[in-house]
């Protein structure tokens, strides 16, 4: 039975998984600078016998293909591998050795889970119905991210379904967090620069006040829209305001941009000798799962991890560039609990962040169950838009 093979193989590889994760944790590389990590991934894939490997996909991406019995279809899994510009404050044997670089979001765990998935697959290749594509992605933490450049470089070529996971310390180990639709919000960044012969403090204050009226007047009561102004610097003649827009609706997003630009023009007209520049930096689109993709995740989890608690979660107001993949092909993204009440209690992006390493085995087991059942999974996702 394939479930027994998955469990036995992952149990056997688990000490190696811990070694892989801790090596990456000790040698983190921040977004768009992950050359050594990419090389580490490639060399490990070669070591376990995978030959179809593409490197420098997009920039630092690595894509591996494992042949199944029928290569006319394929299923993909994605793991991100970039770190954050944070100093690791943990007192552990595997804390970061690189100043101002830390795996403070669990991407080392994601990568380890997918490497373990690849190892089990290559050793049981004859049982694999269709090809499996392993997408190791750089640059998730910093927009514009690595997903879009990797897609533009054809990482999804001939892919029929894609799945991804994020280990999540707000959920306890032994919990699956799922959503049938919206999971992560779009996160767009903008900046407003004010130059004036009047008082920039007053103009900036009026801009701040009016942005919240956009939220209250122009969004529907059940429609999520958050405009956050995170930084304001002001003197008499100059002011700078930076903010983010978070939403799940592209039409609402267009409306908000228009309203903010119109607000800048209105303030220019109201205060003589004033020039206001609105700069839009963009961000990730909302991550909206395909319902059938989430159902396949739930089925796989029930099959391989019957004791795990499955919890439908509210949409998160964070950005995640896996959104780009499910805009291209059917699939879904899930959260998997990695927290506890002791060392793994800290939020993501915290200098003391850590997680229950057992979650890597659980993530790999879900990926493997989907992969070995890829004929049914791909067929069940047909027609998903």
Regions found by a protein language model. Give the residues of each.
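N-terminal hydrophobic/helix-forming segments and targeting peptides
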Residues: 1-22, 28, 70, 123, ...
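Acidic/His- and Gly-rich active-site-bordering loop/insert found
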Residues: 2-103, 108, 112-115, 119-128
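Divalent metal-coordination and catalytic microenvironments
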Residues: 24, 64, 77, 107, ...
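Non-cysteine beta-strand/loop elements that form the S-adenosyl-L-methionine
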Residues: 76-78, 87, 190-192, 333-339
């Amino acid at each position: 039975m394939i479930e027994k093979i998955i469990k036995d193989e992952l149990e056997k590889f688990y000490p190696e998984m811990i070694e892989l994760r801790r090596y990456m944790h000790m040698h983190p590389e921040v977004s768009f600078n992950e050359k050594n990590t990419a090389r580490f991934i490639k060399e490990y894939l070669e070591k376990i016998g995978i030959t179809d490997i593409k490197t420098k996909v997009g920039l630092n991406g690595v894509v591996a293909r494992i042949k199944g019995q029928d290569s006319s279809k394929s299923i993909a899994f994605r793991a991100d591998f970039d770190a954050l510009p944070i100093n690791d404050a943990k007192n552990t044997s595997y804390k970061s050795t690189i100043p101002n670089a830390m795996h403070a979001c669990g991407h080392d765990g994601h990568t380890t889970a997918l490497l373990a998935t690849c190892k089990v697959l290559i050793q049981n290749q004859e049982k694999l119905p269709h090809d499996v594509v392993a997408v190791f992605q750089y640059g998730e933490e910093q927009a514009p991210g690595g997903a879009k450049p990797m897609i533009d470089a054809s990482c999804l070529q001939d892919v029929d379904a894609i799945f991804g996971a994020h280990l999540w310390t707000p959920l306890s180990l032994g919990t699956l967090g799922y959503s049938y639709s919206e999971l992560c919000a779009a996160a767009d960044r903008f900046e407003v620069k004010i130059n004036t012969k009047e008082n920039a403090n007053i103009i900036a204050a009026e801009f701040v006040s009016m942005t919240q009226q956009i939220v209250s007047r122009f969004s529907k009561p059940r429609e999520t829209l958050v405009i956050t102004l995170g930084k304001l610097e002001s003197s008499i003649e100059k002011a700078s305001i930076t903010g983010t827009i978070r939403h799940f609706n592209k039409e609402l997003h267009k409306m908000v941009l228009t309203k903010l630009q119109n607000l800048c023009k209105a303030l220019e007209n109201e205060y003589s000798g004033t020039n206001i520049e609105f700069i839009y930096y963009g961000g990730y689109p909302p991550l909206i799962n395909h319902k059938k993709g989430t159902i396949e995740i739930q089925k796989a989890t029930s099959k391989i991890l019957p004791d795990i608690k499955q919890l439908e979660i509210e949409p998160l107001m964070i950005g995640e560039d896996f959104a780009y993949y499910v805009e291209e092909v059917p699939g879904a993204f899930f959260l998997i609990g990695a927290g506890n009440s002791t060392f793994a209690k800290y939020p993501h992006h915290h200098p003391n962040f850590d997680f229950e390493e057992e979650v890597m085995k659980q993530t790999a087991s879900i990926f493997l169950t989907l992969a070995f059942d890829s004929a049914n999974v791909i067929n069940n996702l047909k027609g998903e838009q």
